[in-house]
């Protein structure tokens, strides 16, 4: 088996995790107490869904997941919620005190106490796997736990499981909506860690997903639950090929191989279609071509950044449901002829497609319509540098005055770490610029036109 462990860190990680596991359980027909009526082989299991669930001898299915937070409130909700019987109590780890939006607390003082316990649990889960394939890590980079503890844990995982893939779903601060004043500090410090210790990072940002919910689902005031359900659909689409059998299956390591041209250029943009409410879905036919156009539309991106301002290096299109390769090839051919969608000149083909016959499921009482087919696109584009430059700018404004820095230094951090992290991100912006620049021998040709 090729198992995958999910690690959910901090409030954002845990709440996205709730939405994901709720959806996985629906897709596989697993009850909130872990029973799965349709599964005939009790105890053992080489079914595809065993990549995400382990089975006990009594036929209970337990998610291969760990939830961690430095303060208990969010995870206590899981301990008392609908799915409380699904998780092993040891998989829900909480500390006593909060990281208080402070990277240094999550990374040095408070986080240090929990990290060994946490790695111990990871080891226990890893020991149950016959062929561990990698980790999915969920966290935000604006808060304290997600950014500080998140990067601490990723560092330690790199040491203990160096060869395993680490895919990271990180919620980045949005341009307008802010939940903390020190977000720019936490994000820059955390990204510095993500650069080194993750293989692929998927960028999400609340504002972009808010706008999607408002515009496409007609939700006046989207709540985090609405946002997380949408994110869960994306993550479910990425992992369907690991949990079900399909025509063109995509493995986790395939993401890396096809999307990451250089080790540092591994921050991906995700988009999903159809984001559509039940009333509308009834009147629209969502063909493969239409879905393919929609995912390239800047307004369906899950992070606030406009791909038209950059060039694509690679795209991964994951279709699910009633889709045949012929339609996909036709749709991709149309996209290639579009002038608005530009690829870097050193990557002529740039598309990887996956098809999975399992149609998308929806959470009952949720906002999304039940549809026959859906598409999730993961793209590597130079436009994602916008996200970094935005955060860097805010970081510079605050750091020039050394505002709030004493909170970090007081928790045992060195001030030099700030400038190191900032320089690393400046280098990253530069990398993105160079990757998108025209190759030297083309310059002459362009001027003649």
From Swiss-Prot:
This is Tubulin alpha-2B chain. It comes from the Eukaryota. Acetylation of alpha chains at Lys-40 stabilizes microtubules and affects affinity and processivity of microtubule motors. This modification has a role in multiple cellular functions, ranging from cell motility, cell cycle progression or cell differentiation to intracellular trafficking and signaling. The modification N6-acetyllysine is found at residue 40. It comes from Physarum polycephalum (Slime mold). Pfam families: Tubulin, Tubulin_C. The active site is at residue 254. The keyword Magnesium applies. Tubulin is the major constituent of microtubules, a cylinder consisting of laterally associated linear protofilaments composed of alpha- and beta-tubulin heterodimers. Microtubules grow by the addition of GTP-tubulin dimers to the microtubule end, where a stabilizing cap forms. Below the cap, tubulin dimers are in GDP-bound state, owing to GTPase activity of alpha-tubulin. SUPFAM superfamilies: Tubulin C-terminal domain-like (SSF55307), Tubulin nucleotide-binding domain-like (SSF52490). One of its GO terms (cellular component) is cytoplasm. It is found in: Cytoplasm, Cytoskeleton, Spindle; Nucleus. Belongs to the tubulin family. Its main location: cytoplasm. GTP binds at residues 11, 71, 140, 144-145, 179, 206, 228. GO terms for molecular function: GTP binding; hydrolase activity; metal ion binding; structural constituent of cytoskeleton. Its cofactor is Mg(2+). The keyword Nucleus applies.
